[in-house]
Structure formats: C-alpha cells, structure tokens
Amino acid sequence: MRTIEFDTHFYKKLWTLMVPIMVQNLMLALVAVADAFMLGGMDQNYMSAVSLATQIQFIQNMFLSAATAGLAILGAQYWGKQDIKALDDIFALAIRICGIVSVLFFVACAFFPRYLMLIFTNEPVLIDYGVNYLKIASFSYLLTGFSQCYIVMMKISEHAGTAAAVSSITVLINIVLNAVFIYGAFGIESMNVRGAALATLISRVLELMLSITFSYRPGYILSLIHISEPTRLGMI
C-alpha cells in the first residue's frame, strides 16, 4: 500500500509564491472597482465611458500577457540552470516585443481615440468622455509592457513578494489619486474621467520606477544580466 508523503519544504515554498501572486491579482481588481465606484457616484456616463475605454487596455494586456508568459516559462527554466546568457537574450526579446506592442497601443489611443471609441459605442457623450480618458491614459499604456517584464523577472528570481509589494503600492496610490483627481481635493479641481486617467498614468510611472529599482538589487536576475547590445540598439 502506497503512502503519501508531504514535502513540507516544497509546500511552504509554493505557498510563498502563490500568496503574493494572489494578492497582486486582488489589488489589480480593486483598481477597476474603485474607478467604477468613484466615477459612478458622480455620473453613470463617466463610469460607462471609462469602462468602454479600458477595453482597449484589456486587449493590450492580452498581448502583453502572451509575451510575458513566454518570458516567465523560459526564464524560470534558465534561472534554474543559472544560464545567465540565455536569460539576457530572453529578457531583451521580451522587452522588445512588449515595447512594440505598447507603442502601437499608445499611438492608437493618443492619436485616434475617437475611432477606437466608435468601435464600442455610438453615443456622442460616451465617446467624448472616452476620448478625454484615452488621451491621458494612452501614456500609461506606453509604460505597462516594460513594467510587466520587470515584474515577471522578479517573480522568476524567487522574489514574488517584492513583485506583489510593488503592484500593491501602485494600486493603493492609484486609488488615493483617483479620489483626489476625480472628486477634487487639496486645491485640485474635480477632473472626473480625466482625473481617473491621470491617476492611472502617475501610478504606472511609479510602478515602472519601483520595478527597475528593485530589479537591479543584489540577488535579483537583473543584477546579473544586461540587455544584449544588438537588442538594445534595435529597441524603440
């Protein structure tokens, strides 16, 4: 009769990886809830317009998730082998792919927001609010791909807790700035949908800064590698 043995060390390590990722996903979901709650409290049209506009970001995230999933799978294998050269090449390729995707979505949202909103609605009011949101939020789309690459690299090097902390801090600041800019506070006038977009942009800038800062600390992958010279020259 076979007996089932539990490797407590394995499950403890698995738990330390699972919990930060769960917390990170929960915090990201809270941003959407906060946006809907705050904007919906002012005007249902604000909430509807932003909900439609953020569908574009959802599509972008699908492309970025595919690229970063490949980075995570291959990167974890090479991290286990301590093949730093391969990690260097994979990270450089992921940065390039995510950079191209981010630039394409930025250009589309910054210069053609009205055409994008027409895909989702014909209501002039919703289109106008959506355009106001996308013109500001588009700059955050330019940064998202890069920060996701750095966060994945932190997870690969067994620093999922740090990645979750970066995302959680970013989300909390986003929610606070939402309240400040949407409702108006500390001498700042109410900016409604533009306030939500500005809060998103500032939080994304902070997320990228924190991700880069932590990623190059001793013990993290990026303290050991550098972006390949050919890829760096070929980047946008």
Predicted features, each with a name:
Residues 1-2, 201-225:
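C-terminal transmembrane helix end/exit motif
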Residues 47-111, 144-163:
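Small-residue-rich hydrophobic transmembrane alpha-helices
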Residues 39-58, 125-129, 193-195, 232:
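Interfacial/gating helices of multi-pass transporter permease domains
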Residues 104-135, 183:
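Short membrane-interface helical motifs at transmembrane helix boundaries
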Residues 26, 30-48, 117-124, 180-191:
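Helix-terminus/linker motif at the lipid-water interface of multi-pass membrane proteins
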Residues 225-236:
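Single conserved hydrophobic/aromatic residue that forms the stacking wall/gate
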Residues 172-208:
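Membrane-interface helix-loop junctions in multi-pass transport and translocation proteins
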Residues 1-26, 232:
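N-terminal membrane topogenesis motif
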